[in-house]
Curated annotation (Swiss-Prot):
Keywords: Actin-binding, Allergen, Cytoplasm, Cytoskeleton. PANTHER family: PROFILIN (PTHR11604), PROFILIN-5 (PTHR11604:SF25). It comes from Daucus carota. Binds to actin and affects the structure of the cytoskeleton. At high concentrations, profilin prevents the polymerization of actin, whereas it enhances it at low concentrations. By binding to PIP2, it inhibits the formation of IP3 and DG. The lineage of its organism: Eukaryota, Viridiplantae, Streptophyta, Embryophyta, Tracheophyta. This is Profilin. GO terms for cellular component: cell cortex; cytoskeleton.
Length: 134
């Protein structure tokens, strides 16, 4: 299975079987910032944004004072799981980032998708990749 298939079928899937309800954007990105696969809607990010995200996984709380930036959009960092998941919020939408051994799994959402639905989609794929040694 290609990385793009993981994004298309496992991240950009229908949410809870509701046609037309899906994440706004998704991607799988290597720890070094290389794009493994992404949806056509995933924002063009800056290398320093990925560096900041990786630093927050190593030093939880690093992004809290400044916010999490992705494609120039600022998200307020909300509760996550140290070393495993970062969650950000902006208005009615947000982002969930799951760290695996080699990659970062991103899900970006907006209403009507809820934070919990995005978390479930992103973390389920991230956990699967971790089980596969990725």
């Amino acid at each position: 299975m290609s990385w793009q298939t993981y994004v298309d079928d496992h991240l950009m899937c229908e949410v809870d079987g509701n046609p037309g309800q899906q994440l706004s954007a998704a991607a799988i990105i290597g720890h070094d910032g290389s794009v493994w696969a992404q949806s056509s809607t995933f924002p063009k990010f800056k290398p320093e944004e990925i560096t900041g995200i990786m630093k927050n996984f190593d030093e939880p709380g690093h992004l809290a004072p400044t916010g999490l930036y992705l494609g120039g959009t600022k998200y307020m960092v909300i509760q996550g799981e140290p070393i495993a998941v970062i969650r950000g919020k902006k208005g009615s939408g947000g982002v969930t980032i799951k760290k695996t051994g080699q990659a970062l799994v991103f899900g970006v959402y907006d209403e009507p998708v809820t934070p919990g639905q995005c978390n479930l989609i992103v973390e389920r794929l991230g956990d699967y990749l971790i089980e596969q040694g990725l």
